[in-house]
Amino acid sequence: MKQLFFLTLICITLSLSAQNTIQWRNDRTGIYHEKGLLTSWPTKGPQMLWHYDSLGEGHSSVAIDANKIYITGMTGNTGYLYVFDMAGKLLKKKDYGKEWDESYNGARGTVTISDSKLYIFTGTGFLICMDQNTLNILWKKDIVVDFGGKNIRWGVNESPLVIGEKVILSAGGKEHNIVALNKKDGSLIWTCAGNGDLSSYCSPLYIANQQVPQIATMMADHILGVDAATGKKLWSFKYANNRKIHPNTPIYHDNMLFCTSGYGKGAVMLRLTNGGRSVEKVWEVADLDPRTGAMVKIGNYIYGSGDNHKYWFCIDWKTGEIKYKDKSFGVGAVIANEDMLYCYSEKGEMALVKATPEKFDMISKFPIVLGTDQHWAHPVIYQGVLYVRHGNTLMAYKAK
């Protein structure tokens, strides 16, 4: 009985810990698990609780841990990490080095938080590890100098993946294509040559429930599966567009891996076989091609929007059948909570949409009137609050 009690306590503790930490798209799926959120919004939108207007340039989303909010931005050509409390009070601001200022300027990859450490991958190609409490830089790596990588057209962009003691990064070098570093000191644990592709703006995904637990990601010309323990390349699938850009983290469920990118390439569904050591194509469809907005899986359906195809789509997970196309709302990023889609248009509107394969069932929408430049940062939901970043402004809305 005592053992059962302690096991239950451990499970509860782990569950609470997971709920209290938000990384890229929550857990990289874009699916949130809040209860009691509003099912419709007032005409002018939900109540704005607070906003902060001095983030500088950038497109990164918020990360949250232990009731503190972390986000990056660029002023001049210097990147800064901002730390807020849940009421929007700025607690700390710390520079971390040069950021991307050559095109679509600003901070890019969302902060990853693990064991009191913060991991930031800059648009200039540095992986930086900071102490979560002091914000001191503990170590950093340069993908060009340390791994033979190259920067890419709009600055490298991914949110580092932490698995146990490893932090995973797409370095993009010929020899050091995907690397696993010790998250404490940055030392190299393993390296994978992959296919020698450059990186392609994709934040990698960890797939734990195969015979060979693995990392799945999209590089410039291939979708890639890598043994998480050893770095051995398990499989690759040729998948390229004319820009070599694949910014959307794949979606995995029950041996199926869904990958998509913009510039007209569309989407492909792969099946992992032989315990994850190989893949086969199940179906492919050209219409669902989000460029930076990603997609979500709810039930047996995938929801997202297009790049060349300026529609919102619903596609059957199993068959690739298109259930609807809708052009009534501008395309952009999507996240989900329960059976509702939160769609953030590149035109600067936020919509609440019922997730149903029957139609794009928009319940409410409101304009995002603060901020600067592109509407590209992905929204975040945490403890009944909807966080929206637009350039130099972070906004918090009451969603519950």
Regions found by a protein language model. Give the residues of each.
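Intrinsically disordered, low-complexity regions enriched for glutamine and histidine
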Residues: 1, 17-18
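Short, Lys/Arg-enriched, disordered terminal segments
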Residues: 1-4, 400
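Noncatalytic, solvent-exposed loop/strand surfaces
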Residues: 18-400
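Sec-dependent N-terminal signal peptides
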Residues: 3-14
